[in-house]
Amino acid sequence: MNKDTIFSAPIEKLGDFTFDESVAEVFPDMIQRSVPGYSNIITAIGMLAQRFVTEGSQVYDLGCSRGAGILSIRRNLQTNQVKIIGVDNSQPMVERCRSHINAYHSDVPVEILCDDIRHIEIKNASMVVLNFTLQFLPRADRLELLTKIYQGLNPNGILVLSEKFTFTNQAMSELLIDLHHTFKRANGYSELEVSQKRTALENVMLTDSIETHKDRLKQAGFSQIELWFQCFNFGSMIAVK
């Protein structure tokens, strides 16, 4: 696993964070050291797939990055009569995802598309995964995507939505942000790395509160919604049709 050193030296003109070649190369290390509970979420996505994915249906991982979620799903399926579709708009991520998926033999077909997730038709879905993806979409586009997902899910289909959250209580918000930064420092990131990455993400990662997510999921049509995992200001929700 290549180590993430992208923000380790001072960057004079710090642009917005993008999932480019340099990020794709170190992404597994970056996300493990940056997102508390990430490996637990990936494991649980497989458990949920075991329970919810049905024969003859399709599974979508929207914003699939290098394919960790897809592999977890595929390992846990009860049937190989399923198609998994992974979508990411980063060509470097897609290339590595395809290579990663192909390194493991399986009879379950997987298609990896380089596209904008807003352009993807969702149909005959028993499971859809948005793992730290929605927060990178413009807020104005989020409800439309979730509505499209709801409509494309089969009855008893599941959406897994993992996000970084904001909190309305200022003191609690500051505490959870500070704990997250402590987590990153404990994983070897310097103050400079934490600061520069935070600045790079400011304009591209627009986070919402748990309440906002729940309200939006209800507007999209979901009625069974639950926060099943949280660590500091990161978490994952499930919504069942």
Swiss-Prot record:
Keywords (A to Z) from UniProt: S-adenosyl-L-methionine, Transferase
Organism: Actinobacillus pleuropneumoniae serotype 7 (strain AP76)
Assembly and binders: Homodimer.
Pfam families from the UniProt entry: Methyltransf_25
Role summary: Catalyzes the conversion of S-adenosyl-L-methionine (SAM) to carboxy-S-adenosyl-L-methionine (Cx-SAM).
SUPFAM superfamilies: S-adenosyl-L-methionine-dependent methyltransferases
Reactions this protein catalyses: prephenate + S-adenosyl-L-methionine = carboxy-S-adenosyl-L-methionine + 3-phenylpyruvate + H2O
CDD domains: AdoMet_MTases
Enzyme Commission number(s) from the entry: 2.1.3.-
Annotated binding of S-adenosyl-L-methionine, by residue: 38, 63-65, 88-89, 116-117, 131, 198
Family: Belongs to the class I-like SAM-binding methyltransferase superfamily. Cx-SAM synthase family.
InterPro entries: CmoA, Methyltransf_25, SAM-dependent_MTases_sf
Protein name as catalogued: Carboxy-S-adenosyl-L-methionine synthase
Single GO biological process annotation from the record: tRNA wobble uridine modification
GN (gene name): cmoA
